[in-house]
Amino acid sequence: MSKVHQSACPLNCWDSCGFLVTVDDGKVTKVDGDPNHPITEGKICGRGRMLETKTNSPDRLRYPMKKQNGEFVRISWEQALDEIADKLREIKETSETTAVLHSHDYANNGLLKALDQRFFNGYGGVTEIVGSICWGSGIEAQSWDFGRSYGHGPLDIYNSKHVVVWGRNVSRTNMHLYHHLQQVKKKGATITVIDPIFNPTAKLADRYISVKPGMDGWLAAAVLKVLIEMGRTDETFISEHSVGFDDVKELLKTVSLEEFIVKTETSMEELEYLAGLYADGPVSTFMGLGMQRYKNGGGTIRWIDALVAASGNVGIKGGGANFGNVQIGESFAKTKLTLPELKTTSRSFSMMTQAEEVLTAADPAIEMIIVTCGNPLTQVPNTNKVRQAFEKVPMTVAIDSIMTDTAELCDYVLPTATVFEEEDIYYSSMYHHYVQYGKKLVEPQGEAKSDSWIWSELAKRLGFGELFEYSTQEFLEMGLSSLEAEDVTLERLKEKGHLPLPVKQVPWDDYQFLTPSGKFEFTSSLAEQKGFSGSLQLNVPEESVFHNEELAGKYPYTLLSIHPQRSNHSQHVPFIEKLQHVQVDISPDIAAGQDLQDGDEVVIFNDRGSMKGKVKVMKQAHAKTINIDEGMWAAFGGSVNALTNDTNSDNGMGSTLFDCLVGLKKA
């Protein structure tokens, strides 16, 4: 019998879509959009629809596996859990619990995925990952400037006179914002896209401005310099609601507009156009993630924040420096789920440098890695070093629903349930403010189990099973307990399917910022407290002609690795045959200079690694620019991260994935 159920998308994405899922005789057969969702309105992308394929795939992991003599063999849950618990017990008795590394990412936005922290805190505390390969630099940057990274509600864009989409290809990664762009353009708003690549979002724009990769912060600084010279800054905001603007003005005096133009590879006309735009608010600015994946990435976001603030576009309807929206995640009582007070010790490795830190760790060395919600061998920079790190560690465990590149490398693989096989609530701290309920629709395939069951069973074996003596409903109610006064309850979520969270739709409208000064900080005291310079700086990408001329001569092209169109990072690649090859997008000047055409096979290389792929000439892109979509599996040509840089960004919390020079030649 066929039945349609409300559900939600778990993927790490801006849009967090509402679903209608069809179940026939205990099997998920179709995933559609929920037309009653107030933001996503029934429209979903192929990545969401593919969750049906992933759930029913014959390649699903269905049984616990152990590697013996280089081959995986099926074992029982009892054996798997006993042996993993034995190793955890041995480490606790003979070493320190920080000899265990919990390597995790954000493959699933379910609230109960946080129960892994409950387990590791109950164990005593382990080595945890801090920072983010995705958006860490920008989140940290906005915490320095505003106190938090808060975004405007999706519908506030209808109050904007102008919209600037800066480094975010919303047609690929934020489809419901793209819909709103179409609508506000019809109502008379202008749309400007700033990006090194002329993408489908740029086709919608009234104006497209190409900027040299990694120099977006310099562009924002140049526009701010023009604004100051025009006398068009918002002096009331600057004098009453900010600190440190004099530092900005003094720095900008040291760089001429001619130097800004040369380094950003833009024009004076473009600078004047943008300055006039920002002075003619309200202007909403939507920032993407790629431009903060450089050594100077945090500074890039800070300069755009500074431009938005100084032009008077903070705290007003139709304005905003929209990057993340972490007020969504802050709404939940996560510490009731994670119990951080149980930790007796801790150690942290950077998300970006975790491989190097595993290889060099001492007192204690890493003896065990447990991977959840991630695929570090594909997604973490410098793939070859990640492989070395995993191969060095005595025991490695992956908890996943498919045999990823990382799982292939591990000693144990534990099969986990997929989104429609377990109950949870879902949200995203990136865009809209609705939380959604996803009930269990079908039974897990084979012997797959929910993550919470796995943690519960391990906890029982290690003597703290009482931490997991709660039902799924009780855990969900814990997470929602902070919202009871707002009538956001599990009962109402089950009834409605989705509910709005009580967050601001226009952040900072009271000009009460969460910085130490209570004001917008052009010079950040929080940065200084953390040991960084608080003043804005004009730094350049580490792998660039401006910083390392010799390296740029050896490897003349900038490599970007943007999000794929049809896969959420690496998750969908094995299910879509058309994705299963490496496509090398090159700017027209590279094609002309090397006599390359679509379909030509090339080798891309630098000192970290190399890979092969087939050329696709971009119609319009900044000179000397190459893109290879991230997420590709080794079986289909390997991850672009064989080439990428594994250093930390300027504020220590983000990746430098795009700070990457390469060479290219015909294969």
Swiss-Prot record:
Its cofactor is Mo-bis(molybdopterin guanine dinucleotide). It is an enzyme of class 1 (oxidoreductase). Residues 2-59 form the 4Fe-4S Mo/W bis-MGD-type domain. The keyword Iron applies. It comes from the Bacteria. Keywords: Iron, Iron-sulfur, Metal-binding, Molybdenum, Oxidoreductase. SMART domains: Molybdop_Fe4S4. Its EC number is 1.-.-.-. InterPro entries: Asp_de-COase-like_dom_sf, MoPterin_dinucl-bd_dom, Mopterin_OxRdtase, Mopterin_OxRdtase_4Fe-4S_dom, Prok_Mopterin_Oxidored. [4Fe-4S] cluster binds at C9, C13, C17, C45. Binds 1 molybdenum-bis(molybdopterin guanine dinucleotide) (Mo-bis-MGD) cofactor per subunit. It holds the Pfam family Molybdopterin. One of its GO terms (molecular function) is molybdopterin cofactor binding. Belongs to the prokaryotic molybdopterin-containing oxidoreductase family. This is Probable oxidoreductase YyaE. It comes from Bacillus subtilis (strain 168). The gene is yyaE.
